[in-house]
Amino acid sequence: MAKSNTVQIKLVSTADTGFFYVTKKNARAQTGKLEFRKYDPVVRKHVTFKEAKIK
């Protein structure tokens, strides 16, 4: 069997609320860290979420 290209990552809120999303990314196609503006329900605003490893 071939090795999978996709890895699971955690998108952590930069508002320091502890809220995070879990998503997948293609590790070979996107070598940099992902950064999105998504909704954080703790602060009830759209904030920047940055990629972190799932431990």
Swiss-Prot record:
Belongs to the bacterial ribosomal protein bL33 family. GO terms for molecular function: structural constituent of ribosome. This is Large ribosomal subunit protein bL33. The keyword Nuclease does not apply. Signal peptide: none annotated. Keywords: Ribonucleoprotein, Ribosomal protein. InterPro entries: Ribosomal_bL33, Ribosomal_bL33_CS, Ribosomal_bL33_sf, Ribosomal_zn-bd. HAMAP family: Ribosomal_bL33. It comes from the Bacteria. It holds the Pfam family Ribosomal_L33. One of its GO terms (biological process) is translation. Transmembrane segments: none annotated. The keyword Protein biosynthesis does not apply. SUPFAM superfamilies: Zn-binding ribosomal proteins (SSF57829). One of its GO terms (cellular component) is cytosolic large ribosomal subunit.
